[in-house]
Amino acid sequence: MTSTPSFRPPLRLWPGIVLAVLLVCFQLAIPVLGPAGPPLRFLGGLVGGLLILLWWLFFSRTPWSERIGAIALMAVAMLVTSRFLHISIADAGQGPLFPILAIPAASVALVAWAVATAGLSERLRRASLIATILVACSAWILLRTGGITGDGRVELHWRWTPSPEDRLLQLAAKPGTPAAAPTKSDAPAPASEPTAPVDRPAVDSRAETPATRNPASAATPKEPHVTLAEWPGFRGPARDGVVRGVRIATEWETSPPVQMWRRPVGPGWSSIAVHGDRLYTQEQRGGDEVVASYSLRKGDPIWQHRDAARFWEPTGGAGPRGTPTLSNGRVYTFGATGILNALDARTGAVVWSRNPVTDTGAEDPGWGFTSSPLVVNDIVIVAASGRLAAYDAVTGERRWIGPEGGAGYSSPHLMTIDGVPQVLLMRGARTTSVSPADGTLLWEHRWAPSASIVQPALASNGDILIVAGDAMSGLGMRRITVRRGAGAWTIEERWTSRGLKPFYNDFVVHKGHAFGFDGSILACIDLADGSRKWKGGRYGHGQMVLLPEQDLLLVVSEEGEIALVNATPDRFTEVARFKAIEGKTWNHPVLVGDVLLVRNGEEMAAFRLSRAAH
């Protein structure tokens, strides 16, 4: 009787190869999917990885010991690895980042192993299988993230490399480095009363010793002298991203922008406010949330105000999200943890400080508090997530709290509709309007659940343009007509369009058209009916301002490039482009006269633009 060797069918590799190729191609194609790209990148990667594991377990024809052993080893390796991850991967507040990254990577590595070792002996195959799984799962210990791009790509760096913030702190700690000796608060202000600015002196950073400190007055705040800032805050004087009265030369090949200065700054997505030779912004410096003033001409630091607070989340990283607001000689700022400050614009001295989060009972919305303060007459208004809070601009006394509503990340927006001044806020599934005098609800329009990030805008006839949607739905834009009736406000929907679907990138309105980002691509729609006129130009998830006298968009890309694009409906035309700053750039650009200011979470720079010949 002769024994016959056991027959082992060949491995069925083609399904695994197909799934792995599709997974990789899907990840590469994400940028063309628009606003839905970021969540689909994570969801698609996870689903693709799990499908590969199902192939391996039930259809690969490998020995059952290898199938089950590989899955078990992968689970154990990921569990052990999770204990040693960098916090930026381990503490992904918006979701389980590590398995979302590790499962697709380990699954593709498994397919690559199966293909590469098909002709090896059983002993070598199993040894290399163990090594492949351990490396694919444990390699994440060596990495950290620098956040996530607008299309959902995780920015990976070696764990031991310093972040831009680390390098900035190391630079500031060097002897002889000029830096402002800051004012400082050890805790957020209580909700009951404004804090007295007694022990929080402002310091001129150009001084060489602490002896030059300018202490804040403990006296009752006085009404400041009325002045108008050139760029008083978020998206300009009207919060519409429009630069009026400025014409620039567009032949950048012959007259390129000239760099005035460049300097490192702390992380944060704050934009810049400008008055005279002073600019103001917010940034994170280690454990302190900082309001900083710099020279517009030279970029030198003038003063810093510090609060002992730090906000961080894995998508956008650390730092404040809101932009300072300038009004009557004061700087109003709202930090990512919810601290509202009124500072003297000249010295940085604290006038008063409040905590609207405590006052409203708002919960952390996840990506931090992002509102930029709005000053209307004698009150300053902020949005603590989806609820408005108003304070006396001089004393900090609480004036009113707005109606409750869904969470959101937009800022209060002043509009005059049918002759009535009102403050609009995008929040959750609704757009609400309140009276700036007392916070009384005037009207409300419901649409669909939304991340509520983008600011509303006015059409030429007074209609309102609003945006709804999130990274998955990308619902688009809607035009509504709001009128004051005999006893109530009436709201009529004119159209809803998917031709322009901004997610967190604000749009501008010009000559009957809206221009903005549809995902990572610029688009133009006709405001008469919402139809798309063109779509073109890939700038990532950037921002823009409009120069209406020249029919021109000044676009800052997510990669820190500046581009000039014609704001005309006939076709997409890029006029010029240059690289301005390094790093992921989500901050709004500022153009004051012929000075262009751009910043991100790593650096800030100023450029002189040539004036156009009239």
Go through each PLM region and give its residues.
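Membrane-embedded alpha-helical segments of integral membrane proteins
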Residues: 24-118
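Internal/C-terminal transmembrane anchor helices
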Residues: 122-147
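Hydrophobic alpha-helical transmembrane segments in integral membrane proteins
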Residues: 138-169
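Aromatic (tryptophan-biased) beta-strands that constitute blades/sheets of beta-rich domains
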Residues: 159-196, 200, 205, 211-264, ...
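Extracytoplasmic beta-rich repeat domains
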Residues: 254-256, 260-275, 288, 304-325, ...
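Structural motif
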Residues: 288-291, 433, 472-481, 521-523, ...
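Loop/turn-rich, solvent-exposed surfaces of beta-rich toroidal or solenoidal domains
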Residues: 472, 497-567
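Blade-level signature of beta-propeller repeat domains, shared across WD40, Kelch, NHL, RCC1
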Residues: 560, 584-614
